[in-house]
Amino acid sequence: MVKLTSIAAGVAAIAAGASAAATTTLSQSDERVNLVELGVYVSDIRAHLAEYYSFQAAHPTETYPVEIAEAVFNYGDFTTMLTGIPADQVTRVITGVPWYSSRLKPAISSALSADGIYTIAN
């Protein structure tokens, strides 16, 4: 199992392309923010796959970008698969699950903070 902090740190480093300043303020729709969010999301799906399958069965019209499914089952470097997913889709899939507030939101905030990324509203 890949640790959440490892995924978030790796995603942020790849997205930034070089070492960034100690703190960076970015728009919530910035692709670097989206990649950190998606890294946390993929890690959460891997850790709680049965919950996601149950949610999908109960909500068959909820669709996910195919890149997310590919990333979940590809245990190598998946970050390049997740680039280019529109910010509105990222927000929709991440906030659309019942455990967003209790599990995903705190993990995303922690990962962004650990990477020195702070967000501002669009």
Curated annotation (Swiss-Prot):
It is found in: Membrane. The gene is PAU5. The keyword Membrane applies. InterPro entries: SRP1_TIP1, Yeast_SRP1/TIP1_CWP. It comes from the Eukaryota. It holds the Pfam family SRP1_TIP1. GO terms for biological process: fungal-type cell wall organization. PROSITE patterns: SRP1_TIP1. Belongs to the SRP1/TIP1 family. Seripauperin subfamily. Keywords: Membrane, Transmembrane, Transmembrane helix. GO terms for cellular component: cytoplasm; fungal-type cell wall; fungal-type vacuole; membrane. The chain crosses the membrane at residues 7-24. One of its GO terms (molecular function) is structural constituent of cell wall. This is Seripauperin-5.
